Each structure stands twice: as structure tokens, then as C-alpha cells.
């Protein structure tokens, strides 16, 4: 799939971003336009959702070691309510969480 070289979200991503609210923003990570949220020591990347049928993927990254995801959810349907519920749970668990080398 070809992605735009600009930092513009697709219409489907814009709808999801609007649904998620002002705590989320657009970002460009590894050449892909994504939805992003900073949680302090962790960050959330919401990938995919570029077209009507493309699934959504959610990644939680430890900001001190960005080579390692600490949680991921792949091939999620574009069910905004379900995605928001999952993200709310992730936010509760990772906001202000101290780094833990035993994860």
C-alpha cells in the first residue's frame, strides 16, 4: 500500500482521531502517518485505518527503549467504540507508570 509522504491523516484516520478526542494527535512514525498519544514514560501509536477495510493496530512503546513494544494489538476492526475502550484501559495502566525491567 502506498502512503502519502505528507504528514496528513487519511479521511478514516481523521474520523478515528476525532472520535478519540484531544488527548490524541497525528504523528509520523517510521514513514507512516499515525495517531499518537504520549503517556509520560510510554507512548501509544495507532497504526492502520487508512482505508475503510484496513484493520487497526495499537502499539505501546517504552520511551526509554523504543526498539521494544510492551503491548500490541493487531488486526482490530474499525469499531471506534471498542478501540476507545481498549485505549482507555491502556491509558489507565500506563499513565505515569514507572519503568519496570521485569515487564
Language-model-detected regions and their locations in the chain:
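Negatively charged, low-complexity tracts enriched in Asp/Glu with abundant Ser/Thr
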Residues: 1-40, 61-81, 97-103
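A short, charged, amphipathic alpha-helix used as a generic interaction element across diverse proteins
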Residues: 79-90
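A short, structured beta-strand/loop element
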Residues: 42-63
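C-terminal alpha-helix
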Residues: 89-93, 97
Amino acid at each position: 500500500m502506498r502512503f502519502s509522504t505528507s504528514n496528513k491523516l487519511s479521511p478514516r484516520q481523521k474520523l478515528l482521531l476525532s472520535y478519540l478526542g484531544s488527548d490524541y494527535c497525528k504523528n509520523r512514525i517510521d514513514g507512516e502517518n499515525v495517531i499518537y498519544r504520549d503517556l509520560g514514560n510510554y507512548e501509544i501509536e495507532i497504526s492502520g485505518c487508512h482505508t475503510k477495510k484496513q484493520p487497526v493496530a495499537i502499539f505501546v512503546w517504552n520511551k526509554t527503549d523504543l526498539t521494544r513494544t510492551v503491548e500490541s494489538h493487531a488486526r482490530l476492526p474499525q469499531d471506534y467504540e471498542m478501540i476507545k475502550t481498549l485505549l482507555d484501559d491502556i491509558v489507565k495502566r500506563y499513565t505515569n507508570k514507572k519503568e519496570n525491567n521485569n515487564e
